[in-house]
UniProtKB/Swiss-Prot annotation:
InterPro entries: Ribosomal_uL6-like, Ribosomal_uL6-like_a/b-dom_sf, Ribosomal_uL6_a/b-dom, Ribosomal_uL6_bac-type, Ribosomal_uL6_CS. Part of the 50S ribosomal subunit. NCBIfam families: L6_bact (TIGR03654). It comes from Staphylococcus aureus (strain NCTC 8325 / PS 47). Keywords: Ribonucleoprotein, Ribosomal protein, RNA-binding, rRNA-binding. This is Large ribosomal subunit protein uL6. One of its GO terms (molecular function) is rRNA binding. This protein binds to the 23S rRNA, and is important in its secondary structure. It is located near the subunit interface in the base of the L7/L12 stalk, and near the tRNA binding site of the peptidyltransferase center. Pfam families: Ribosomal_L6. SUPFAM superfamilies: Ribosomal protein L6. PROSITE patterns: RIBOSOMAL_L6_1. The keyword Metal-binding does not apply. One of its GO terms (cellular component) is cytosolic large ribosomal subunit. One of its GO terms (biological process) is cytoplasmic translation.
């Protein structure tokens, strides 16, 4: 059995989960998420727990078992606690600022780069060099943080660029002279 799939999902008291066939809606204090999950999986919902049950031990069902459980658990965690990704801007003159709900990055290009805020996603800037991406969908938060990082990924010679907080950037030595 899948190690991830067989774990039971605990539901906090302030979160409600409703199933309509294979479509699930999760409501909590931070918002509401809905998604269509794998139609082969079944869900056993008790008072404050949900168990994902697979129909057979075929390879396809085994792989989808853990994925379905992880997606459902991420939705429950998102509406109850939310997700945060923190990015750091490293480099001389690199800075971030808010313009309404959107994020403006000055990262060494001839023009500022504007990142639009998506639905259920908020940005916050601390000390002009630290950007927080917050939201209820783990998938959206991670994708938007990755898009921001891809504007100027950290380079290996000086370490300049946009990196995740705590990310290790492998450094290289420059060319040696004659």
């Amino acid at each position: 059995m899948s190690r991830v799939g067989k774990k039971i999902i605990d539901i906090p008291s302030d979160v409600t989960v409703t199933f309509d066939g294979n479509h699930v809606t999760v409501k909590g204090p931070k918002g509401e998420l809905s998604r269509t999950l794998n139609e082969r999986m079944t869900f056993k919902q008790e008072e404050n727990t949900i168990e994902v049950v697979r129909p057979s031990d075929s390879k396809e069902d085994r792989t989808n078992h853990g994925t379905t459980r992880a997606l459902l658990n991420n939705m429950v965690q998102g509406v109850s606690q939310g997700y945060v990704k923190v990015l750091e801007l490293v480099g001389v003159g690199y800075r971030a600022q808010m313009q309404g709900k959107d994020l403006i990055l000055n990262v060494g290009y001839s023009h500022p780069v504007e990142i639009k805020a998506e639905e259920n996603i908020t940005f916050s800037v601390e000390k002009n060099t630290v950007v927080k991406v917050e939201g209820i969908s783990k998938e959206q938060v991670g994708a938007l943080a990755s898009n921001i990082r891809s504007v100027r990924p950290p380079e290996p010679y000086k370490g300049k660029g946009i990196r995740y907080q705590g990310e290790y950037v492998r450094r290289k030595e420059g060319k040696t002279g004659k």
